[in-house]
Regions:
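The feature primarily captures lumenal catalytic ectodomains
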Residues: 1-178
Length: 178
């Protein structure tokens, strides 16, 4: 982990975003194209109305942001969540330490659990980040077109309550005790 911490620190300094003790913020990664949350608007509204999450969760489409802005979001957070995909690589940049827990939630499209690689679980372990995983059902627009193949579509319909409960557990973990 020491090499990863040095790398994370160097990148943070390069972008001018290195934080010593970021807030208990959670960045939820949204996607465009494949593996989107089809009920994203409802889910975001539910998070906004959830007193456990509304003040700490921010949503971002990383592919629409400059790299420095992406780095600033993550360096100012303690947790990251999203549907399986390369945006979760930012898990390596969460400022985890023995006295500063961080967390990652990887949402797998149904059918992905056995064939999805363990990259983000392994990356979390290397960075001492608590790894969490949820499986969510493929959206109807995938099932009709691709016979339930997450590789061809991968769009999901999230169970808002289930995902929000997991996010709340993560926020509780990363929130400093008073």
């Amino acid at each position: 982990q020491a090499q990863l911490v040095r790398f994370r620190t160097t990148v943070g300094v390069s972008f001018g975003v290195a934080r010593q003790n970021p807030a208990a913020r959670l960045v939820f990664l949204l996607r465009s194209g494949n593996r989107v949350i089809v009920n994203e608007n409802v889910f975001q509204a539910d998070v906004a109305n959830d007193s456990r999450l509304s003040s700490v969760v921010s949503f971002a489409r990383m592919e629409e942001l400059p790299l420095a802005t992406q780095a600033a979001l993550i360096y100012d957070a303690r947790a990251i969540a999203g549907v399986h995909g390369q945006g979760l690589t930012w898990t390596a940049f969460l400022p985890a330490a023995d006295d500063r827990p961080c967390a990652c939630l990887e949402i797998h499209p149904e059918g992905c659990s056995h064939s999805c690689k363990s990259d983000y679980r392994d990356l979390s372990a290397m960075n001492k980040v608590q790894y969490n995983r949820l499986v969510q059902p493929l959206a109807n627009n995938c099932i009709a077109k691709y016979a339930a193949s997450w590789r061809m579509c991968g769009n999901i319909t999230v169970n808002s309550e289930q995902v929000r409960d997991k996010l709340a557990q993560m926020v509780a973990l990363v929130t400093p005790r008073q």
